Amino acid sequence: MIKKFDKKDEESGIGSNPFQHLEKSAVLQEARLFNETPINPRRCLHILTKILYLLNQGEHFGTMEATEAFFAMTRLFQSNDQTLRRMCYLTIKEMANISEDVIIVTSSLTKDMTGKEDVYRGPAIRALCRITDATMLQGIERYMKQAIVDKVSSVSSSALVSSLHMTKISYDVVKRWINEAQEAASSDNIMVQYHALGLLYNLRKNDRLAVSKMLNKFTKSGLKSPFAYCMLIRIASRLLEESEEGHNSPLFDFIESCLRNKHEMVIYEAASAIIHLPNCTARELAPAVSVLQLFCSSPKPALRYAAVRTLNKVAMKHPSAVTACNLDLENLITDSNRSIATLAITTLLKTGSESSVDRLMKQISTFVSEISDEFKVVVVQAISALCQKYPRKHSVMMTFLSNMLRDDGGFEYKRAIVDCIISIIEENPDSKESGLAHLCEFIEDCEHTVLATKILHLLGREGPKTPTPSKYIRFIFNRVVLENEAVRAAAVSALAKFGAQNEPLLPSVLVLLQRCMMDSDDEVRDRATFYFNVLNQNQLALNTAYIFNGLTVSVFGMEKALHQYTLEPSEKPFDMKTVPLATVPFLEQKTDLAPIATKQPEKMVPVRQDIFQDQLAAIPEFKNLGPLFKSSEPVQLTEAETEYFVRCIKHVFPNHIVFQFDCTNTLNDQLLEKVTVQMEPSEAYEVVHYVPAPSLPYNQPGISYTLVRLPDDDPTAVSCTFSCTMKFVVRDCDPQTGVPDDEGYSDEYVLEDLEVTLSDHIQKILKPNFGAAWEEIGDTYEKEETFALTTTKSLEEAVNNIIKFLGMQPCERSDKVPENKNSHVLYLSGVYRGGHDVLVRSRLALADGVTMQVTVRSQDETPANVILVSVG
């Protein structure tokens, strides 16, 4: 009697998998049945299925046992059962890499490949190419050429796809089959034409001219396969992105013409390609949007989903271009497919007017509980974007988000909501109290440690600045009583910030910290003891240094420096200035609502600058330069499409700059050796040493370094322009083999000029409490001057220009200029080369142009002078 499974069993998978408890040893024992005569096709099929199942589940087969099973399986070629033979082909492909002497089946596969049974020929080709290596390929070359142009479409497709895989083993041999591939590309069969185009592109993709010619040929002659058209559109859009012609190119005209194709998949591919092209204007997007608008009313759910998802992407950059589709999108709100309805609403949230927000929020609340967490995150992202667009609607959004926060959901969903509320609080000061209240309510019953610590950190930063900070103390101390160690430690830090900034609350906070000093966890006790003693001193300087600002160094770098210090005992105390600064301030990281893996990294990963520090320290000439202060973003020194690609990264040390030149040779008939970049400075900078890249083979990047000493006599000379010339020895080589000539000749290539500016000497560091930091530094080295920015037309432009020029970190969200204001104060903080803290207060007034009063405070006189001289 067959057991009947109910629906729950079916969903959970109970009883639905007959191979669930297979054991490898038992299956290999069964494989001996292959040697029996006569062959039992039905039983052998079942055993082969078990072997394939185990292989695909990741079961490890030893070489000996795999080879034994493989040899037993080869006897099955004696059977004429079609299903068994095709299962043998599949098993050969799966066991090719784990068995020895698999080439024993070559003759059997070649026989099937050239036989009269069409049903065997295609699978035999695929299996044969799986076991063939570069030395055997020429032996089957004649058969492969014949198979590519075979009249049977399954045989031709198998040969084309196998050829594509064989290019990884022997590109040069497969390239000789290009004429056959071109013949196959004119086939009437849609799959053969698609696979032929794929092979042709793969053989020519490194030759831009050849790809362009291929595109021209097929765009003029036309194609019968919609799949091939889709591939052609993708190739064209890739070329278009690299081209300087942009949207005036014939390639763009071709993609646009595909919007009128009779196949829906081609129309969608063309629309998607246009939308994803960089720098597209609303006018150029219009035809693609019109097509997607038609798809919104399609009876096919897949088309409706594709259309609304793509329109959702367009709405992020060009909301006005999608406004014409609003009526169609509103019709999709009631779509039976919840994914389509969600995307329709989130698109409308991006394109709708301020007056439609309330209605849309009401509609989405009716079914938000029914959709998956993934789509709930999409809704939250749309709300976040809407808050930035219509700040006055923050109360509606906040209420909606708080309701979502109470619903059940996973970590990613909850994190997206928390991040969205935090971004609303940061963008709209009016929403701060209601936002903090919702977050306080959430942490009362929050199972995610990461979110609880994040919210406590926010409460410590923003809570003390609210009109009634005392109301948050209860929520924070509850965490100390009820939560795990990590959350308790975060709560202690938050309490300390309230005590440091609010004199009336200090006695209460000290009492609470004393209670925390009895905690069972070391970290919590240590924090409580440390903060209690700092707060007891009642000194602003101590509060600023140890409670407000915290560490500004790279934690990974500090760990390494401390380890090094313990290995080499010294009487000198450990100097924090030897530790590289953190390149990304901890509090500056922008809220990212894109889903990421919930698993947190177990080990601390070194950041970009820590990696550069290790790389440079390994070069003897740079070993004694001191700690790496800052590494710039890459600067491109050559145009795209030139013979050589060169970009530069500036590594700034206390008294030197190391210029790292990443060089790539794009000529396949040249090998470059002894590559250096000669630099001629315009100021008092001195070039000390060159470290050449030993060789640059075709398309393999190499690194050359130039070491420059900063001027000692004039510390304000921070800006300099270098003329750069790449010098090298050229050895011509054969493009096919890459073998170079014995002798070479010297040559050079002029690069773009390279500038060192003030921002290269300053590292961004965020000061969470700018006022306290300003008072702590004091006015010993304070400088002040007033400037007129006559060409600047708005306060926003002035703020952006100042931040970019100085390379400093905006504090107190002062980079955001309030609407309809004629004056503004910009607060900036950073660390000047050598480890000196520097703060800038810039008062801006808008009249005829912008008047700017700059006040600089620093721990040393040099940074203050440098900034005012550079600005002037």
Swiss-Prot record:
It comes from the Eukaryota. InterPro entries: ARM-like (IPR011989), ARM-type_fold (IPR016024), Clathrin/coatomer_adapt-like_N (IPR002553), Clathrin_app_Ig-like_sf (IPR013041), Coatomer/calthrin_app_sub_C (IPR009028), Coatomer_g_Cpla (IPR032154), Coatomer_gsu (IPR017106), Coatomer_gsu_app_Ig-like_dom (IPR013040). It holds the Pfam family Coatomer_g_Cpla. GO terms for biological process: intracellular protein transport; vesicle-mediated transport. It is a peripheral membrane protein. Keywords: Cytoplasm, Cytoplasmic vesicle, ER-Golgi transport, Golgi apparatus, Membrane, Protein transport, Repeat, Transport. Its main location: cytoplasm. It is found in: Cytoplasm; Golgi apparatus membrane; Cytoplasmic vesicle, COPI-coated vesicle membrane. One of its GO terms (cellular component) is Golgi membrane. The keyword Protein transport applies. HEAT repeats lie at residues 64-101, 283-320, 321-355, 356-392, 395-430, 467-504. One of its GO terms (molecular function) is structural molecule activity. Belongs to the COPG family. Oligomeric complex. The coatomer is a cytosolic protein complex that binds to dilysine motifs and reversibly associates with Golgi non-clathrin-coated vesicles, which further mediate biosynthetic protein transport from the ER, via the Golgi up to the trans Golgi network. Coatomer complex is required for budding from Golgi membranes, and is essential for the retrograde Golgi-to-ER transport of dilysine-tagged proteins. This is Coatomer subunit gamma-2. The gene is copg2.
